[in-house]
Amino acid sequence: MALGKNKRISKGGKRSKRGKAQETMARKEWYDVVAPANFEKRQFAKTICNKTQGTRIAADVLRGRVFEANLADLNQSAGEEEAYRKVRFTVQEVQGRNLLTQFHSMEVTTDKMASLLRKWCTTMETTVEVKTADGYTMRLFVVAFTKPQANQQSRNCYAKQRLVKWLRMRITKMIKRRLSKVQIKEAVSLLTRNVLSDALVRRCNPILPLRELRIRKVRVVRTPKFDAQALLSAHGTIPASVEADQREVEEAVEAAPAAEKAAE
């Protein structure tokens, strides 16, 4: 009786052409993500990437990555009051083990926006697109809520449509006037330190009494041609990545015993 092939029995004479499997983490490197100089905490995150091999360059893979951080972690002097805002950065240049980033967007958390909603008031929203002095086009989403006037007897505080249009026009003019004269670095400082929103409240309160006015979202929709000198001036003194050097030493120490075993 002829026996058929048993697929469960592997042939002992056949060997794999591949060598010993290399550990995945041995092919990777750690990098520090650095925020611009107008934030207190510069190195706010770490990321990992494969080492440069042949035509696949690690710097090209890292450029364009977007990282998100909490504003309270970036500006620790502000405390937990700024924990409701998230700031995103995009990598533009790789310098050693440091990733130099630029502002990408900012957004208010969903739970904070839900806490601002009330009954018996008017919610006003407007969108403003402005171009900074150095060529960045930013789109701002502003939301405002009315409040009752002093000695008001009525329960609600609804606003008339003509006042809402007037308020939107004033917000648009003021944002364009303030942000079109500054560069992206100063514009981010005005947004993150509530300088612009406080100025908007002071200018809009004579039209309508406002309970809250927030810039709920900011996006960079268009960027100018990459300028390395402008990026370096925005970062100023870049902190040294001491931990990256320590990691290289640890990798060398771990690789030494493995090389000795292979030689034996």
Curated annotation (Swiss-Prot):
Feature: compositional bias, Basic residues: 1-19
Location(s) in or outside the cell: Cytoplasm
Protein name, UniProt field: Small ribosomal subunit protein eS1A
HAMAP family: Ribosomal_eS1_euk
SMART domains assigned to the protein according to its UniProt record, in alphabetical order: Ribosomal_S3Ae
Quaternary structure (record): Component of the small ribosomal subunit. Mature ribosomes consist of a small (40S) and a large (60S) subunit. The 40S subunit contains about 33 different proteins and 1 molecule of RNA (18S). The 60S subunit contains about 49 different proteins and 3 molecules of RNA (25S, 5.8S and 5S).
Region (Disordered): 1-23
Cited InterPro entries: Ribosomal_eS1, Ribosomal_eS1_euk
Leader peptide range in chain numbering: none
Organism: Leishmania infantum
Single Gene Ontology MF annotation: structural constituent of ribosome
Family: Belongs to the eukaryotic ribosomal protein eS1 family.
Superkingdom of this protein's organism: Eukaryota
Pfam families: Ribosomal_S3Ae (PF01015)
GO cellular component, one term: cytosolic small ribosomal subunit
Main location class: cytoplasm
Keywords: Cytoplasm, Ribonucleoprotein, Ribosomal protein
One GO BP annotation of this record: translation
